[in-house]
Amino acid sequence: YLDSGLGAPVPYPDPLEPKREVCELNPNCDELADHIGFQEAYQRFYGPV
């Protein structure tokens, strides 16, 4: 399936994207994610991914 504008394949939707966005909106979670990775940071703030 091709994107109508760019002619490039549409990337597979990331099931973790909504959680990644939640973490990015929390400055503390976002900063921690830069050091230890998104999934580990998310778990520390919000519980299991």
Swiss-Prot record:
Any one GO CC term of the record: extracellular region
Post-translational modification note: Gamma-carboxyglutamate residues are formed by vitamin K dependent carboxylation by GGCX. These residues are essential for the binding of calcium. Decarboxylation promotes the hormone activity.
UniProt cross-references to InterPro entries, sorted A to Z: GLA-like_dom_SF, GLA_domain, Osteocalcin, Osteocalcin/MGP
Cysteines paired by S-S bonds: C23-C29
SMART domains: GLA
One GO term of the biological process aspect: regulation of bone mineralization
Keyword set, alphabetical order: Biomineralization, Calcium, Disulfide bond, Gamma-carboxyglutamic acid, Hormone, Metal-binding, Secreted
Positions contributing to Ca(2+) 2 binding: E21, E24
Binding-site residues for Ca(2+) 3, renumbered to this chain: E24, D30
Binding, Ca(2+) 1: E17
Every Gla domain range: 1-47
Top-level taxon in the UniProt lineage: Eukaryota
Subcellular location: Secreted
Its biological purpose: The carboxylated form is one of the main organic components of the bone matrix, which constitutes 1-2% of the total bone protein. It acts as a negative regulator of bone formation and is required to limit bone formation without impairing bone resorption or mineralization. The carboxylated form binds strongly to apatite and calcium.
PANTHER family per the UniProt record, alphabetical: OSTEOCALCIN (PTHR14235:SF0)
Entry similarity comment: Belongs to the osteocalcin/matrix Gla protein family.
Protein name: Osteocalcin
Organism: Canis lupus familiaris (Dog)
High-level lineage: Eukaryota, Metazoa, Chordata, Craniata, Vertebrata
Name of the gene encoding the protein in the UniProt record: BGLAP
